[in-house]
């Protein structure tokens, strides 16, 4: 998540952009890219011979899904802190002490926790769109470059950036 191809790679690419674009921060892009980086590690075989590592990766996916439910529960459904902690305990197998500070963060930063999985899902959706539209012209590396070279952008701009990649590669 924090390393390559996650935030480190995203940061390296952002250093190539004009200053104003390198300082913009859109949580769904940044955290979504980092989760997508975790997925890339899995797809590229990082866990093929490390079963416990893959289990940790899968557990982290479940944790991120719980985050979305808990953040929404707290801010849209009127959940208490105790309900949020209990959701993690019951649904993810977390220990209360492990998630209490997480829940406190969600209480003080509405919507931040949902950005991880929302951004990841949008990047995955855009990749599927590129693969489907481009067929054999789709290039895995070029797609990923198009995403990160576009900079840390809102999700609607990401879609436009991928659209330009598709148009340039489909010709």
Q: What residue ranges belong to the model's regions?
A:
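N-terminal maturation segment of proteins
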Residues: 2-171
């Amino acid at each position: 998540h924090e390393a390559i191809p996650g935030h480190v790679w995203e940061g390296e690419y952002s250093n190539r952009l004009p200053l104003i674009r390198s300082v913009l921060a859109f949580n769904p892009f940044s955290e979504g890219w980092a989760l997508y980086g975790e997925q890339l590690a899995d797809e590229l075989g990082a866990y093929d011979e490390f079963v416990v590592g893959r289990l940790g990766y899968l557990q982290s996916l479940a944790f991120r899904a719980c985050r979305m439910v808990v953040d929404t529960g707290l801010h849209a459904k009127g959940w208490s802190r105790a309900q949020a902690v209990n959701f993690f305990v019951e649904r993810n197998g977390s220990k209360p002490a492990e998630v209490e500070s997480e829940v406190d963060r969600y209480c003080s930063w509405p919507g931040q926790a949902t950005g991880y999985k929302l951004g990841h899902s949008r990047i995955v959706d855009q990749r599927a769109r590129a693969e489907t539209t481009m067929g054999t012209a789709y290039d895995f590396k070029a797609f990923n470059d198009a995403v990160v070279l576009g900079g840390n952008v809102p999700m609607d701009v990401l879609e436009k950036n991928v659209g330009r990649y598709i148009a340039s590669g489909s010709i």
